[in-house]
Structure formats: structure tokens, C-alpha cells
């Protein structure tokens, strides 16, 4: 019960920390390790990077109303991630080609561990974790308004 209370009270901080780790990790991989960034990766970044600032400010101010603005970005980032992951893991899965001709193809795997963990998989994982914490923040907001 104490762990649940801790997660509920600090859910915005945990969501912000997840966004921060995802942002810094993607910047490290592209700027330091020089892993090429495809178009779908850029779309995922567009969804995740603003969350680092939004969730950081919201966590500092304990503004749980940010969930209404952050959750759509998280869901959109998840959709881009799962689409790219399916493109990488299922040969021939690409009904819609979202990659341009100047960037690397979105189905190319540039980094992989254990045979299934790729960069889009980590993006999916980060968005699922953020969704969990944002939903916890939303429901703790409802409880506070009811009291």
C-alpha cells in the first residue's frame, strides 16, 4: 500500500523522469553513437521531447491537469513506435511508407539486443511507462476533486 501511495503521489515526477531518460537516450544514440535517425524516429521524438519540459514543469508545480495535454502526445508516440517496430519485425509490413528518400529506411535495425529489443521497442516501452504514470496522476486528481 505504501508503494502505491508513493507511485500515486509522485506519478508526475516518474513520468517526467521517463521522458527525460527517453530524450537523453535518443540524443546520445544519435549525436554521440551516430546512429542514423529515420523519419518515424523523428515523429516519435516530436511527441516525446516536449513532454520533458511539460511534465517537468507540471511535476514541479504539482499540476495534474497536464495529463489532458500530455497523454495524447504519449499515445501518438506509442502509435509511431509500434508501427515502426512492426515494420522492423515483420518482413513486408509497410502498407504506408512514411520514410523519405533521404533518410534511412524505417525498417532498418541499427541497434538490437536479445533479438527483439530495438529502438522503437524502447520507445514503446517509454510511452507505456509514461501512460501508466499519467493515468495514475489523472485518477489521483479525480480523488482529490471528489474530497
From Swiss-Prot:
Protein family per UniProt: Belongs to the DsbB family. BdbC subfamily.
Any Pfam family matching the protein: DsbB
Annotated protein name in UniProt: Probable disulfide formation protein
Keyword Ribosomal protein: no
Cellular-component GO terms for this entry: plasma membrane
Subcellular localization(s) per the UniProt record: Cell inner membrane
PANTHER family noted in UniProt: DISULFIDE FORMATION PROTEIN-RELATED, SPBETA PROPHAGE-DERIVED DISULFIDE BOND FORMATION PROTEIN B
Segments traversing the membrane: 9-28, 43-62, 69-86, 115-138
InterPro entries: DiS_bond_form_DsbB/BdbC, Disulphide_bond_form_BdbC, DsbB-like_sf
Main localization, broad class: membrane
Keywords for this protein: Cell inner membrane, Cell membrane, Chaperone, Disulfide bond, Electron transport, Membrane, Oxidoreductase, Redox-active center, Transmembrane, Transmembrane helix, Transport
GO terms under biological process: protein folding
Protein purpose: Required for disulfide bond formation in some proteins.
